[in-house]
Regions:
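Conserved AMP-binding/adenylate-forming
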Residues: 1-20, 106-126
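ANL superfamily adenylate-forming
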Residues: 33-105, 150, 154-159
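Compositionally biased, low-complexity linear motifs
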Residues: 105, 110-111, 137-156
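Anion (oxyanion) recognition and catalysis
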Residues: 16-17, 129-130, 151
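C-terminal structured interaction module
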Residues: 119-139
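A generic local structural motif
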Residues: 23, 97-101, 122-123
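Short beta-strand->loop structural element characteristic of the AMP-binding/adenylate-forming
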Residues: 1, 8-12, 16-41, 46-55, ...
Length: 159
């Protein structure tokens, strides 16, 4: 959806827990597309996320999309699937074994306007989960605002 939005981490981890692989863009094997509310991209099944900070619904949901906000009405259940280390976690070529080999980070790190892709997911999500650290993501802010957030959150910006 957007590398700087928390809902991206939710969908990536949800896919991995179900034994699915994640791709940055739709491809021939796409079963489900998860997109932001401004996206025109569609998959065989498309879930649209408003990207509202509190996860509110999409104000004008297209007829060919499901609204991510609908999951809030569902019970909290965890249905993790056993996953082989050799199965692909991120397309192309990143296995679940590769995911757990990402160096963990126990630091409090701030990322400003991260680019989409595996590098963002491994740094913003995987490294702090494996290392007990935390991530602050800032999007669309000025350098001054980013520096103020870094000071407030007691982090150092990561280039």
């Amino acid at each position: 959806t957007d590398p700087g939005h928390w809902v991206t981490a939710v969908w990536v981890t949800a896919a991995w827990q179900r034994g699915c692989s994640v791709a940055e863009r739709n491809g021939d094997e796409t079963a489900l597309a998860v997109v932001g509310s401004l996206s025109q991209e569609r998959g065989p099944v498309t879930v649209m996320c408003s990207l509202h900070p509190l996860g509110l619904g999409v104000p004008a949901l297209p007829a060919d999309c499901a609204d991510y906000a609908d999951v809030l009405a569902e019970p909290d259940m965890h249905w993790a699937e056993p996953v082989s280390p050799d199965e692909l976690a991120w397309l192309p070529g990143i296995t679940h074994a590769d995911v757990v080999r990402v160096p963990g980070s126990g630091q409090r790190r701030l990322f400003a306007d991260p680019e989409p892709g595996w590098a963002a997911v491994s740094n913003l999500l995987v490294a702090p989960v494996l290392g007990g650290g935390s991530t602050v993501v800032v999007t669309g802010a000025t350098a001054e605002r980013t520096a103020r957030i870094a000071a407030e959150e007691r982090t150092a910006p990561v280039a």
